[in-house]
Regions:
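Short aromatic-glycine-(Arg/Gly/Cys) micro-motifs in beta-strand/loop hairpins
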Residues: 1-16
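Broad hydrophobic/π-residue packing in well-ordered secondary structure
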Residues: 2-4, 29, 56
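Short linear proline/tyrosine/threonine-rich motifs used for host-factor recruitment
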Residues: 4, 17-19, 54, 64
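Short, flexible N-terminal segments of the mature chain
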Residues: 14-38
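Short, mixed-charge low-complexity intrinsically disordered segments
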Residues: 35-70
Length: 70
């Protein structure tokens, strides 16, 4: 079974890697976390391909999630 990794990085917080059993679970977790961060920090989540970026209205990036399929 292939493992799907999500790489999370945030300015001032460093980075972390999370592993999921399938792509659907990984994407659901990314979207949930991105919404939460956007709500807490007044940003907006933008999903493009295998990546979600949360940024403030001026464009300053708050956090990023990248899907890595193995």
């Amino acid at each position: 079974m292939a493992v799907v990794k999500v790489i999370f990085s945030a300015s001032g917080f460093g980075s972390a890697t999370y592993e999921y059993a399938d792509e659907e679970s990984a994407r659901a977790a990314m979207r949930c976390d991105a919404r939460e961060v956007a709500d807490e920090h007044g940003g907006k989540a933008n999903e493009v391909g295998d990546e979600i970026v949360v940024a403030r209205p001026g464009g300053e990036e708050i956090a990023r999630w990248e899907l890595e399929k193995s």
